[in-house]
């Protein structure tokens, strides 16, 4: 880590106070499966930077369990039929691929990533068949007789039995990311008749994002990021975005360790932490009441900026657009405001002040303060 004396001071970045989450109208499954996230304001360009990174992390980075193999009484290979079962083994495999599992939070195998074998005994007798109209459906919920995993879709049909029988079924479940074809799945102690499946581990179905223009005060040169996330129910969209953010942070931390100069960001002053009356007394001061050079005072006067309130609400880029207003004047003004515990680009919305009404509001507050002093006198 570099010595703090070599730190670089950067202007503050506009950042959202929070990320807003909302349901997507008409989406199946509600907010537990589909949600929209809005983050604004962001500096220009950061919308696409964050949106693209989050999208990739959501699609390829999240882990979830999936069935990677199975075996069943009477099944020797994938290309066969089983007497008394409507579906052939190929269709049973397809149905197993549609199984959605999530793990109970407090149950874990050693190391957390090992595969686990789940065994179930399926017994179908004549009364079961009669009650089901001659065809007894065996669902994912029927196969999860051990309490390690929970089925998101327990009513999902795996196969259909047409005669009395007893079957032993073994499902092997593993954790992974993204999608893995069966050829890439390596199993320890694979059984002779154990059939390996392609596995869709990713719980994220779809991620879309777009970037809109938004404003801070009267400045419209900022981004609004809108991110829409759809999952299959194994994780909620809110969890998925939180996990993806942690994954990205983990990877960025590798580059942060480089022994280079550190950036210190100027932060916006929170008027909630300051006494509002004290701040108002500073805001209504005239520019000529603080010690600025003649050049800086004239620049502000030519820009029709008469009070500190009119000054601090201005974003720095806006000031630099004024005629004859250069870096030297900017530096002087920023230092003076820093002494007053103020800064450029302040959010004065708590006082009902914006760029469109700041001049009128400063006059109104100045009159209010004078009236208050006269009353006390």
From Swiss-Prot:
A single GO cellular-component term on record: DNA-directed RNA polymerase complex
Coiled coil stretches, renumbered: none
Reported function: DNA-dependent RNA polymerase catalyzes the transcription of DNA into RNA using the four ribonucleoside triphosphates as substrates.
Protein name: DNA-directed RNA polymerase subunit alpha
Alpha N-terminal domain (alpha-NTD) as annotated region, ranges: 1-259
Domain notes: The N-terminal domain is essential for RNAP assembly and basal transcription, whereas the C-terminal domain is involved in interaction with transcriptional regulators and with upstream promoter elements.
EC number assigned by the record: 2.7.7.6
Sequence segments annotated as region (Alpha C-terminal domain (alpha-CTD)): 279-377
Subunit field text: Homodimer. The RNAP catalytic core consists of 2 alpha, 1 beta, 1 beta' and 1 omega subunit. When a sigma factor is associated with the core the holoenzyme is formed, which can initiate transcription.
Pfam families associated with the record: RNA_pol_A_bac, RNA_pol_A_CTD, RNA_pol_L
Catalytic activity: RNA(n) + a ribonucleoside 5'-triphosphate = RNA(n+1) + diphosphate
A Gene Ontology BP annotation from the UniProt entry: DNA-templated transcription
Gene3D superfamilies assigned to the protein according to its UniProt record, in alphabetical order: 5' to 3' exonuclease, C-terminal subdomain, DNA-directed RNA polymerase, insert domain, RNA polymerase, RBP11-like subunit
GO molecular function terms attached to this record: DNA binding; DNA-directed RNA polymerase activity; protein dimerization activity
Entry similarity comment: Belongs to the RNA polymerase alpha chain family.
Keyword annotations from UniProtKB, A to Z: DNA-directed RNA polymerase, Nucleotidyltransferase, Transcription, Transferase
């Amino acid at each position: 880590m570099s010595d703090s004396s070599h730190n670089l001071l950067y202007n503050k970045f506009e950042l959202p106070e929070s990320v807003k989450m909302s349901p997507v109208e008409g989406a199946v499954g509600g907010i537990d499966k589909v949600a929209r996230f809005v983050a604004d304001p962001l500096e220009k360009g950061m919308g696409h930077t964050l949106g693209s990174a989050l999208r990739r992390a959501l699609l390829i980075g999240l882990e979830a369990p999936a069935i990677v193999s199975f075996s069943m009484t009477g099944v020797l290979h994938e290309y066969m039929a089983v007497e008394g079962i409507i579906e052939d083994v190929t269709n049973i495999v397809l149905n197993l691929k549609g199984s959605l599992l999530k793990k109970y939070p407090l149950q874990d195998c050693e190391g957390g990533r090992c595969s686990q074998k789940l065994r179930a005994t399926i017994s179908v007798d004549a009364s079961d068949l009669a009650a089901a109209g001659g065809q007894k459906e065996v669902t994912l919920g029927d196969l999860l007789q051990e309490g390690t995993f929970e089925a998101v879709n327990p009513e999902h049909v795996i196969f259909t039995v047409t005669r009395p029988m007893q079957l032993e079924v073994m499902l092997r479940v593993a954790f992974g990311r993204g999608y893995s074809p069966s050829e890439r799945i390596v199993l320890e102690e694979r059984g002779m008749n154990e059939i390996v499946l392609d596995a869709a581990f990713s719980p994220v179905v779809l991620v879309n994002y777009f970037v809109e223009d938004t404003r801070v005060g009267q400045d419209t040169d900022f981004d609004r990021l809108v991110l829409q996330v759809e999952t299959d129910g194994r994780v909620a969209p809110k969890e998925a975005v939180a996990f993806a953010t942690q994954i990205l942070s983990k990877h960025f931390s590798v580059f942060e360790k480089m022994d280079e100069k550190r950036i210190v960001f100027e932060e916006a002053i929170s008027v909630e932490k300051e006494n509002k009356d004290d701040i108002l007394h500073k805001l209504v001061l005239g520019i000529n009441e603080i010690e600025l050079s003649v050049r800086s005072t004239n620049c502000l006067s030519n820009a029709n900026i008469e009070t500190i309130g009119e000054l601090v609400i201005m974003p720095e880029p806006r000031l630099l657009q004024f005629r004859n207003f250069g870096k030297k004047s900017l530096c002087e003004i920023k230092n003076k405001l820093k002494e007053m515990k103020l800064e450029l680009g302040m959010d004065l919305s708590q006082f009902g002040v914006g760029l469109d009404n700041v001049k009128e509001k400063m006059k109104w507050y100045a009159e209010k303060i004078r009236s208050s002093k006269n009353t006390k006198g």
